[in-house]
From Swiss-Prot:
Name by which UniProt lists this protein: NAD kinase
Species this chain originates from: Hamiltonella defensa subsp. Acyrthosiphon pisum (strain 5AT)
Biological classification of the source: Bacteria, Pseudomonadati, Pseudomonadota, Gammaproteobacteria, Enterobacterales
Any one GO molecular-function label of the UniProt entry: NAD+ kinase activity
Residues of the active site: 73 (proton acceptor)
Gene: nadK
Family annotation (HAMAP family): NAD_kinase (MF_00361)
Catalysis: reaction(s): NAD(+) + ATP = ADP + NADP(+) + H(+)
EC code(s) of this entry: 2.7.1.23
Cofactors, names only: a divalent metal cation
Protein location: Cytoplasm
Keyword Kinase belongs to the record: yes
One Pfam short name: NAD_kinase
NCBIfam families: PRK01231.1, PRK03378.1
Record's keyword terms, sorted: ATP-binding, Cytoplasm, Kinase, NAD, NADP, Nucleotide-binding, Transferase
Amino acid sequence: MNKKFNSIGILGRPRDSEALATHHMLYHWLKSENYTVIVEREIADALSLRDVTTASLKDIGSQSDLAIVVGGDGNMLGAARILAQYDIKVIGVNRGNLGFLTDLSPDNVQKELSEVLKGEYLTERRFLLETQVKSSLTLIEPNNSSCPRTPNLTGTAINEMVLHPEKVAHMIEFEVWIDDLFAFSQRSDGLIIATPTGSTAYSLSAGGPILTPTLEAILLVPMFPHTLSARPLVINSNSKICLKFKNSNHNLKISCDSQTVLSIGNDQEVVIYKSAHHLNLIHPKDYIYINRLNTKLGWSKKLF
């Protein structure tokens, strides 16, 4: 039997009246079931709840056993990057579009969530990616004002990191190094570095393969490469990826889950690697990933 829950956090951005109605219903239902309920401050304000315990996303992560995210996959991604730093399980109620990460139907949420709260659920540990944008110079004089040290920029992603130019439809040149060994150079519109979770997101649109969520692998998918030999590449999740730029790389960016964007300066390189943190995503007991793909991607039924 899985661990049961005592303290439950409710979060998600109050985008519309339907999402807020789900937040409102969940809060009052969980309180009637005698759970300790913590509501994200934005939600509590939007619902005008009184005598309610509110907290920031980080505080919910540290104080709750379970976080319920109401919204779409974008809401889940934004919350998950922070919640993954804490020992908390996460489940989603789909108030978005596709809903790969948000399992529960808002029309049947009480019934489905009741079983989960009894300990009837499946747990998946989804790994994250981290990136550093740092100087590519091997030696920098820290006291030399003519050669100042540029602070490292960092980012985290559940789905993917995307290297891209600021200018739309603009080809860039870069090298890819894997575990300190040269792998390939490329002229393209960019590169997608995706987790198995992200293999059904932007990577899929660029022709990348679908990876099962618990596979320990990282996916590299070229974006409109200027060569027929460029193909998606799947590597071990423990690999370190380094993106290097021979020429002045004006206005290059690294996008993390399309929500955080880091700028790449001249004489900088990008390092991407598996994070030490995991997202503890839980599902109803009857969750089957292949069935999820059938439903969400509209795959046809058996031909014979």
